[in-house]
């Protein structure tokens, strides 16, 4: 399809783009917000592949969620129907899929840094080619993009950064950069030439603009305005069916009875279920932009000033603030509550978004407490507990992107026997995995993963064989902590761990992935 595109006259590009859009819309039935983002840059996608000699020229898409037409143009049209499904292609960019996917992505604000690396490598190799990054105005709020602009602007390399400005990402864009004047002033202050194009959905205008800026030496920015179609109804959660619904409903009740709790989120309120509360509680639900590190240290500042900050953040994005958790919060023992959404396997978003690493790294930080509810009511009990009794240090409440039936309303308790009888074998599990499992002869659910509750070691001593189950990967976490405790107690028994493998797990339905990666016997 690329060869067909490049053989066209400029006057034929609009019809070609419209036909391509129709084919992609007919093929894609999943993740409609990402389809909307892809359609917003339909004309840009066609113009880029028309003007550039990809894959020899470098084209980097930030995040990659907007690359559905890019995939279609580069030989994957027939695979779009199975995108994000088991065995199908990724919903993001993947170097394993195509040479046209120069740099894999899934998280925001990385594209300009990647392009900086390309420029440095090309300097050493004395290689001349076009180098282009496409970044949305939402991703441009991320600190890494500013760091990269600052560095790349000093290299004097021939490079183009295209700012796709549709005034939103998952949530509406926040921050002081909000119009062509502020963008232009900022870019020029960092040594970048700046060009603005209002007609970002006009393929002919885009081709002309690209040809002009690519002919200019040095670092160039092309700021285009685009419009994203609205194809999906407002997101809602059926009452009582998901952890996100339980979190949002409980927070709404807490806000009714308290006035001092503030919740910060790095541009993820739309997926949290909290979005309907933002109009009523604008001063207490604070969108910080795609800035995980900044978000966490801001929460630390609120806590240091005597406030009560909570941070809503996806597990996969918590990784981006690891240093701030240690240096700014844990080291100072500041009372910050983290609502770690999407903990565990997340399904069709795949390896860039699975929340399978945080449990291991959190439990290695001094002074940290980690909770993992098994159902909606337990999550509710946890949130009500921390609202009623302020925490003494950092607390992380991990919950998955999953369905839950709720369970029996209860006050928070650190552990619960799901089944107890005779036998020398003990199952220890945590989180939503506890509710999925067929109960063993003795099955103990740990709502508090860490630190262990008083008396846990005594319970372990009553059993000869300990099975530990957790929906995470790596060598630490709950399983590592149980093994360490057994060694400390000189426990003579055997500890058998059931974890996800130490690998990047592909996309697919959560239950299917669990069954395929070691849990089939127990679910």
Model-found features: residue ranges?
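Active-site cofactor/substrate anionic-group-binding motifs, chiefly glycine-
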Residues: 284-295, 309
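Cofactor-/ligand-binding subdomain signature composed of acidic, glycine-rich
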Residues: 1-27, 186, 232-236
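Short, glycine-rich nucleotide/cofactor-binding loops
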Residues: 136-141, 241-242, 291, 313-316
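Glycine-rich anion/phosphate-binding loops
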Residues: 317-324
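Conserved glycine-bearing catalytic or ligand-binding loops at nucleotide- and phosphate-handling centers
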Residues: 372-390
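Cofactor-binding active-site loop characterized by glycine-rich and histidine/acidic residues
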Residues: 33-155, 261, 274-275
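Proline/glycine-anchored alpha-helix kink/cap motifs
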Residues: 44-50, 115-123, 159-161, 251, ...
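Thiamine diphosphate
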Residues: 82-114, 124-128, 154-234, 245, ...
């Amino acid at each position: 399809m690329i060869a067909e595109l490049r053989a066209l006259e400029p006057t034929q590009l609009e019809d070609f783009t419209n036909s391509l859009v129709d084919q992609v819309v007919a093929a894609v039935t999943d993740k409609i917000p990402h389809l909307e983002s892809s359609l917003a840059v339909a004309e840009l996608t066609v113009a880029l592949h028309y003007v550039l000699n990809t894959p020899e020229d470098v084209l980097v898409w930030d995040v990659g969620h907007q690359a559905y037409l890019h995939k279609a143009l580069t030989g994957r049209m027939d695979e779009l129907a199975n995108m994000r499904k088991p065995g199908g292609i990724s919903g993001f960019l993947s170097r394993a899929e195509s040479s046209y996917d120069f740099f894999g992505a899934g998280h925001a604000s990385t594209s300009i840094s990647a392009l900086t690396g390309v420029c440095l490598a090309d300097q050493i190799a004395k290689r001349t080619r076009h180098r282009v990054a496409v970044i949305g105005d939402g991703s441009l709020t991320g600190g890494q993009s500013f760091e990269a602009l600052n560095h790349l602007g000093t290299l004097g390399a021939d490079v183009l950064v295209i700012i796709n400005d549709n005034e939103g990402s998952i949530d509406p864009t926040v921050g002081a950069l909000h119009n062509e004047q502020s963008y232009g002033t900022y870019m020029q202050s960092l040594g970048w030439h700046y060009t603005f194009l209002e007609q970002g959905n006009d393929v002919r205008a885009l081709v002309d603009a690209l040809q002009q800026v690519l002919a200019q030496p040095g670092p160039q920015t092309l700021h285009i305005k685009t419009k994203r179609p609205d194809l999906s109804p407002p997101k809602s959660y059926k009452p009582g069916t998901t952890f996100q619904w339980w979190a949002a409903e409980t927070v709404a009740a807490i806000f009714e009875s308290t006035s001092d709790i503030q919740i910060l989120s790095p541009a993820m309120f739309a997926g949290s279920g909290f979005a309907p509360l933002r109009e009523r509680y604008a001063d207490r639900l604070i969108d910080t932009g795609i800035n995980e590190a900044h978000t966490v240290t801001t929460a630390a500042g609120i806590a240091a000033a005597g406030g009560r900050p909570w941070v809503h953040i996806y597990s996969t994005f918590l990784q981006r603030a690891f240093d701030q958790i240690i240096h700014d919060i844990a080291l100072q023992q500041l009372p910050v509550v983290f609502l770690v959404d999407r903990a565990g396997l997340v399904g069709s978003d795949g390896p860039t978004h699975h929340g399978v690493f945080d449990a291991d790294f959190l439990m290695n930080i001094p002074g940290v407490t980690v909770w993992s509810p098994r159902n909606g009511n337990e999550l509710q009990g946890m949130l009500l507990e921390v609202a009623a009794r302020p925490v003494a240090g950092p607390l992380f409440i991990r919950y998955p992107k999953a369905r839950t039936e709720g369970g029996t309303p209860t006050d928070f308790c650190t552990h619960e026997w799901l089944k107890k009888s005779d036998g020398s074998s003990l199952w220890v599990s945590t989180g939503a995995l506890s509710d999925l499992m067929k109960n063993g002869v003795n099955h103990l659910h740990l709502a508090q993963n860490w630190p262990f509750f008083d008396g846990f070691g005594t319970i372990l001593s009553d059993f000869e064989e300990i099975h530990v189950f957790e929906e995470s990967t790596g060598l630490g976490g709950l399983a590592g902590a149980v093994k360490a405790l057994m060694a400390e107690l000189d426990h003579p028994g055997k500890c058998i761990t059931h974890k996800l493998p130490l690998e990047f797990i592909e996309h697919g339905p959560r239950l299917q992935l669990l069954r395929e990666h070691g849990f089939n016997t127990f679910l």
